[in-house]
């Protein structure tokens, strides 16, 4: 168990160190890019200033050369007889002088280019050394502050964890309240429906009771009417029988009131 814990802790430290080293390398690369851009801009501005100075010096040199040629050009020479001498020697001297000046100018331009190349090499070497020095200083500073950076990272991780836990608890509490509110709403709805059904059931029971009472009343009325009809029939039957008896009595009474017939036999002689 101890070995596994030490291995996991070493792996976590190694992963953290690798992450820090990657971050440091990215920051160093970004700082190097910015430094290169700044130096390239400064070199470009210096070159532009040199070109402007060279162009001004060239224009000044050409102007001064023309002035010198005008001042150095000898007057037209004549012989003892007043004839103009040939200008070939003067032209040759002028061409020779121009060639010498051109050589001097070319040498000057070569020296300027050589100086620019040397300055550029010096600037590049200086920039490289400065960059290496800055990277070394940054590496040393990061190495010195490694423990502090790790503690800060752990602190921020713990703080982010606490914030996430708090947000999660708040979200769970909101969900719980929402579920309770929904459950209460469902219970209220079910209670309302139940009360409505009970009300409907009571109303139906009342209607059924009223209908049953009315039906019982109707049945009693029908029974009473049937009893009355039966009594009426019995009464009519009794009256009919009574009348029939009276009629029979009358018929029988009439028979009794007739003269009696005598059926006597005479004596034979």
From Swiss-Prot:
Places the protein is found: Nucleus; Nucleus speckle; Chromosome
Species of origin reads: Danio rerio (Zebrafish)
Q: What is this protein called?
A: Arginine and glutamate-rich protein 1-B
In which domain of life is the source organism classified?
Eukaryota
GO molecular function annotation: pre-mRNA binding; transcription coactivator activity
Region span, Necessary and sufficient for RNA binding: 1-70
Q: Where is the composition biased (Basic residues)?
A: 1-57
Q: Does the keyword RNA-binding apply?
A: yes
Tell me, according to the record, the phenotype of the null mutant: Morpholino-mediated knockdown produces embryos with expanded brain ventricles and a curved body axis. Embryos have imparied movement without lethality up to day 9 post fertilization, after which they die due to an inability to feed.
Q: What does this protein's UniProt record list under function?
A: Dual function regulator of gene expression; regulator of transcription and modulator of alternative splicing. General coactivator of nuclear receptor-induced gene expression.
Q: Where is this region: Necessary and sufficient for transcriptional regulation?
A: 71-269
**By its UniProt entry, which InterPro entries does this protein fall under?**
ARGLU1
Q: Which GO terms describe its biological process?
A: mRNA processing; regulation of alternative mRNA splicing, via spliceosome; RNA splicing
Q: Give a Gene Ontology cellular component term annotated to this protein.
A: chromosome
Gene (name only): arglu1b
Span-the-membrane segments of this chain are none
Question: What broad class describes the main subcellular location of this protein?
Answer: nucleus
Instruction: Specify whether Nucleus is a keyword of the entry.
Output: yes
The biased composition feature labelled Basic and acidic residues covers 64-80, 89-109, 233-249
Q: Which UniProt keywords apply?
A: Chromosome, mRNA processing, mRNA splicing, Nucleus, RNA-binding
Query: Which parts of the sequence are annotated with region: Disordered?
Result: 1-109, 233-269
Let me see what the UniProt entry remarks about domains. The N-terminal region can bind RNA; preferentially binds 5'-CGG[AG]GG-3' motifs.
Q: What family does the Swiss-Prot or TrEMBL record give for this protein?
A: Belongs to the ARGLU1 family.
């Amino acid at each position: 168990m101890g070995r596994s814990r030490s291995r996991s802790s070493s792996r976590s430290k190694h992963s953290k160190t690798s992450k820090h080293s990657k971050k440091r390398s990215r920051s160093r690369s970004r700082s190097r890019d910015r430094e290169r851009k700044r130096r390239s801009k400064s070199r470009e501005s210096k070159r532009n200033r040199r070109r402007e100075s060279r162009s001004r010096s060239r224009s000044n040199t050409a102007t001064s050369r023309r002035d010198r040629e005008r001042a150095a050009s000898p007057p037209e020479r004549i012989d003892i007889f007043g004839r103009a001498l040939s200008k070939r020697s003067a032209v040759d001297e002028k061409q020779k002088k121009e060639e010498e000046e051109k050589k001097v100018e070319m040498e000057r331009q070569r020296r300027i280019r050589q100086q620019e190349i040397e300055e550029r090499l010096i600037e590049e070497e200086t920039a490289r050394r400065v960059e290496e020095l800055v990277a070394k200083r940054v590496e040393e500073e990061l190495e010195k502050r490694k423990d502090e950076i790790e503690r800060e990272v752990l602190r921020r991780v713990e703080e982010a964890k606490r914030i996430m836990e708090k947000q999660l608890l708040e979200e769970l509490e909101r969900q719980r309240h929402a579920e309770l509110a929904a459950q209460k709403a469902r219970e209220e709805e079910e209670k309302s429906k139940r009360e409505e059904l009970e009300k409907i059931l009571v109303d139906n029971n009342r209607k059924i009771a009223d209908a049953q009472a009315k039906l019982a009343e109707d049945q009693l009325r029908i029974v009473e009417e049937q009893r009355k009809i039966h009594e009426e029939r019995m009464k009519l039957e009794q009256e009919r029988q009574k009348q029939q008896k009276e009629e029979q009595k009358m018929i029988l009474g009439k028979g009794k009131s007739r003269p009696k017939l005598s059926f006597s036999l005479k004596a034979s002689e």
